[in-house]
């Protein structure tokens, strides 16, 4: 498509005026179509073809002849409107893009056909894994979003619940604790202790009064401030605390006086310990008297009748085996029917008796060995 505007030396509007001045007959003869074509050609809207043979028309006949020649010839002129030109341009662009996409798809298909089957399989697997990964990522994002929403909702509910409870529960707790001090004091009075020392009563009372439960009850009652009953209970507990403090101070003074001793004891505790020790001494003194009364003075160990019979049998056998002189030297004293009188200390007498028995046993063993050898 070539457009030459250099040959149009004169203004088309001035040329149209000259044509009107030459004769009105040409205008009356020309049809509306010819006038439209002339205006469109003069205005040079959109021209398709070459404009080499275009020249200034002399009359309407020359214009009609030139138009007829241009229509019959190869180099014909076509006037296109701007809208039509735009639609054709868009259509040509779409056709070109379609052709490029078709050629690219054909090229890809040909490349896939030319590739190795293992490569195609791997590519398909990669695409499948990519789809699975994208699905997993989207699911994970949804789960995280739901978790954040749930966390925010629970946190808001907890905050709302805590704020709601803080006002009602505090009031109910205050009213409940205001009723507990009397019960706590009754429980303290029911506890009964049996002390060993009189001073332990004070210690146990201080321990009971120092326990945290009654103090907490009294403190709760003080904070509650429910009336005269609470104030009376508080006074009662204050009096007991003051009494326990006084007893505790008195005991400390007594213990400080006995700080020189190894064990700190009060006077009452000392008296109690002395009484217990006296009882123990009396018991110890009574037990030896009972033991000595069972034995006669000057008499030590005496064999039982069964043992005495056994010793008599041994002596009779020895008398048969030994000569008379040897037998008289080794025979037992119990066989004579009387006991030798022992003089001196009881301990010496027992030692002598033991030595005599050991000597007799040795002699008996020697005699038995001799008999076995013979």
Curated annotation (Swiss-Prot):
Coiled coil: 262-290
Pfam family, one: FSIP1
UniProt KW keywords: Coiled coil
Biased composition (Basic and acidic residues): 12-28, 45-55, 65-77
Region (Disordered): 1-80, 95-120, 225-244
InterPro entries reported in the protein's UniProt record: Fsip1 (IPR026246)
Sequence similarity: Belongs to the FSIP1 family.
Name used for this protein in its record: Fibrous sheath-interacting protein 1
Organism: Danio rerio
Gene name per UniProt: fsip1
């Amino acid at each position: 498509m070539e457009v030459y505007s250099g040959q149009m030396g004169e203004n088309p509007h001035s040329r149209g005026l000259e044509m009107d001045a030459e004769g009105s007959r040409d205008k009356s003869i020309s049809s509306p179509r010819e006038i439209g074509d002339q205006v469109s050609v003069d205005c040079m809207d959109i021209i398709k073809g070459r404009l080499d043979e275009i020249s200034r028309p002399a009359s309407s006949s020359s214009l009609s002849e030139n138009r007829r020649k241009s229509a019959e010839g190869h180099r014909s002129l076509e006037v296109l409107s701007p809208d039509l030109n735009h639609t054709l341009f868009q259509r040509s662009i779409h056709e070109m893009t379609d052709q490029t996409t078709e050629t690219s798809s054909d090229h890809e298909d040909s490349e896939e056909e030319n590739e190795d089957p293992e490569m195609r399989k791997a590519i398909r697997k990669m695409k499948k894994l990519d789809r699975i990964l994208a699905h997993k990522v989207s699911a994970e994002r949804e789960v995280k979003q739901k978790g954040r929403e749930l966390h925010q909702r629970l946190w808001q509910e907890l905050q709302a619940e805590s704020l709601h409870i803080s006002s009602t529960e505090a009031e109910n707790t205050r009213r409940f604790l205001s009723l507990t001090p009397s019960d706590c004091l009754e429980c303290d009075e029911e506890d009964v202790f049996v002390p060993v020392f009189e001073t332990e009563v004070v210690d146990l009372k201080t321990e009971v009064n120092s326990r945290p439960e009654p103090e907490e009850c009294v403190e709760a009652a003080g904070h509650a401030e429910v009336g005269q009953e609470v104030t009376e209970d508080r006074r009662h507990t204050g009096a007991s605390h003051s009494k326990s403090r006084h007893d505790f101070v008195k005991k400390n003074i007594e213990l400080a006086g006995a700080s020189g001793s190894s064990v700190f004891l009060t006077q009452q505790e000392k008296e109690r310990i002395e009484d217990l020790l006296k009882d123990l001494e009396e018991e110890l003194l009574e037990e030896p008297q009972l033991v000595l009364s069972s034995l006669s003075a000057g008499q030590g160990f005496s064999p039982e009748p069964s043992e005495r019979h056994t010793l008599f049998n041994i002596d009779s056998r020895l008398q048969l085996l030994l000569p008379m002189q040897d037998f008289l030297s080794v025979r037992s004293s119990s066989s004579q029917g009387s006991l030798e009188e022992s003089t001196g200390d009881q301990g010496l007498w027992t030692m002598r008796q033991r030595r005599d028995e050991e000597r007799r046993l040795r002699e008996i063993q020697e005699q038995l060995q001799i008999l076995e050898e013979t």
